[in-house]
Amino acid sequence: MNDILSIAPRDKAEILAQALPYIRKFHGKTMVIKYGGNAMTDPALQADFAEDVVLLKLVGMNPVVVHGGGPQIETALNRLGKKGEFIQGMRVTDAETMEVVEWVLAGEVQQDIVGLIHQAGGKAVGLTGRDGGLIRARKLKMVDNKDPNIEYDVGQVGDIVSIDPSVVRALQDDAFIPVISPIGFGEENESYNINADVVASKLATVLQAEKLVLLTNTPGVLDKAGSLLTDLTAREIDALFADGTISGGMLPKISGALDAAKAGVNAVHIIDGRVPHAMLLEILTDQAYGTMIRSH
């Protein structure tokens, strides 16, 4: 938070005074945060994110972190001479790729996040979908967005069957910050790679979260001219799907966000993780950042 330390004392007091109503309003509430994009690869942004999560916990909120790891997985696959393939925003995951995904997400990325949170003064525990039976999954049946008669085989990519949040709630009650890798398990104990945005959205619904915040590499959802769309309803999102404005990796992100909004998550925000402390600005100020998704 070096940029915050340089702020004049009078301005700091003003910021804290503005945050107080939101601290009161969200005290005891669950905030599910999908952590991904440049915020995961830039060391300064990594430290900022960890400090922001710890701050939310210290002021009485219950942050739950679900992380991605696409760039790190891609780097590991490249080292093995294996080329990544995506269909409709989902990584095709054969058995070898699944091993790499598990190792990178649970063994590398997750532990880095947990370590940074500890360094910032918080207490974090890393989980995968196997821990406490958190995420049960099955093979994803993927059909073409435009022609449902076309089906794709994406390997060990998972579709969530159920989420048992008891282990997450137990950690929250013990003042820990859960850090979750998006890996599920199936009936035969097989592992599944699940899109982190989808996991975050489903988990936010099950936990009855106050907010779902998705950190991305863009200012939010952009129209075809590149302008930010600050507020989107289900009907508007359907139109953006139909005309191809929302495509690729944004498809599962927006679909999951909309599902969470429809299921009762009070606020769903897609914000720019490249902006230092963007999450705090979204949660603790009256300034609107990024795109807000509403069911109607």
Swiss-Prot record:
The keyword Iron does not apply. This is Acetylglutamate kinase. One of its GO terms (biological process) is arginine biosynthetic process via ornithine. One of its GO terms (molecular function) is ATP binding. The record marks 34, 253 as: Transition state stabilizer. Substrate binds at residues 69-70, 91, 193. It catalyses: N-acetyl-L-glutamate + ATP = N-acetyl-L-glutamyl 5-phosphate + ADP. Belongs to the acetylglutamate kinase family. ArgB subfamily. It comes from the Bacteria. It comes from Delftia acidovorans (strain DSM 14801 / SPH-1). Its EC number is 2.7.2.8.
